[in-house]
Amino acid sequence: MEGVGGLWPWVLGLLSLPGVILGAPLASSCAGACGTSFPDGLTPEGTQASGDKDIPAINQGLILEETPESSFLIEGDIIRPSPFRLLSATSNKWPMGGSGVVEVPFLLSSKYDEPSRQVILEALAEFERSTCIRFVTYQDQRDFISIIPMYGCFSSVGRSGGMQVVSLAPTCLQKGRGIVLHELMHVLGFWHEHTRADRDRYIRVNWNEILPGFEINFIKSQSSNMLTPYDYSSVMHYGRLAFSRRGLPTITPLWAPSVHIGQRWNLSASDITRVLKLYGCSPSGPRPRGRGSHAHSTGRSPAPASLSLQRLLEALSAESRSPDPSGSSAGGQPVPAGPGESPHGWESPALKKLSAEASARQPQTLASSPRSRPGAGAPGVAQEQSWLAGVSTKPTVPSSEAGIQPVPVQGSPALPGGCVPRNHFKGMSED
């Protein structure tokens, strides 16, 4: 713990820099509006194209190779909590309001360009469609997140208190909203799937293939928020080559050796179920008593979409109609800038006892997850244009866990809806 204690003054100094407090990137890493071009000096990991790099490869430059155990990040993209490494998600949940929804205030840096803003807003809207989480505009709340384009993709786990940074560099947005969803799941209190306490039943960690010194990113957690069976298709799962030293797999699935892991397309069905279970709610509000997790339709007309969702959709629709979006506003609504002269500083999470771990069950795979399967009918990447044109206000209900069997996916599936890697944004050229 001595190394960690000596590190915190440096970390706090980093988070107090003007580029962080003002919700703007560091001047050396982002001049003007941060676009979606790949920064100079970054090289692909192994044979991966630069646009296909996942979180570990993007963040690798933030971790000192000589002493990776002293990094301010753990597990590749999580800001190290202090003084203890792992906490139960129930100790730092975001509070539920009287309306039965969980509001997470956010600030979006004005340094993002319009395509980048659209990707981030799409991720916020996906949570609102599928869960009781509502990302609302910051209005002097004590606890809030500040989304800024620093170097790398990282966040804290759960509500830390005061302002907490969510870094989404332009490279984190090149593959669409998947990495944004991943980091926001951290914000809501969830750790990585591949570090679950029961992970050894479902994956094998190939320690000899991990970059020397980076083994700390594969240590099993003691977090108790598993809540659902192991899910190979979770947006919280890292890919096979995470922190690979020579391009060979560091993670091997055991139940389905050829299954795709590390998808960054959308929330899986179990990702949604975890959010609903952790916060004790349904997609439209609190969980109905005596009727299970999801209430069925009563035949009445659906309630209007919430104001926050309407604002997000208006912004996205306006941008989709504009042939050349520019400026710092979207859909006639100004995009909030950084936190400015925020009176709130960084605070450590509260320490609580860990609750009992959920019993292990069979893992889910990409093929068995209706939301993560390419071309699936649930509102995800494949239906992006349909909900922009006219979104249904009836929330999507994730499939039941019962009867789900792990089915291996042969090879690497195509992106949903005909999406092309590294060409998510308007105007981006194919390399």
From Swiss-Prot:
Ranges annotated as spanning the membrane: none
Cofactor comment: Binds 1 zinc ion per subunit.
Signal peptide as annotated in the record: 1-23
Biased composition (Polar residues): 319-328, 361-371
First-listed, main subcellular location of the protein, grouped into a coarse class: cytoplasm
GO BP field: cell adhesion; fertilization; negative regulation of binding of sperm to zona pellucida; positive regulation of protein processing; prevention of polyspermy; proteolysis
Region annotation (Disordered) ranges: 283-304, 317-431
Residue ranges occupied by any Peptidase M12A domain in the UniProt entry: 85-282
Residues of the active site: 183
Top-rank taxon: Eukaryota
A Gene Ontology molecular function term of the record: aspartic-type peptidase activity
Disulfide bonds: 132-281, 153-172
Cofactor section: Zn(2+)
Name of the protein described by the UniProt record: Astacin-like metalloendopeptidase
Annotated source species: Homo sapiens
Name of the gene this protein is made from: ASTL
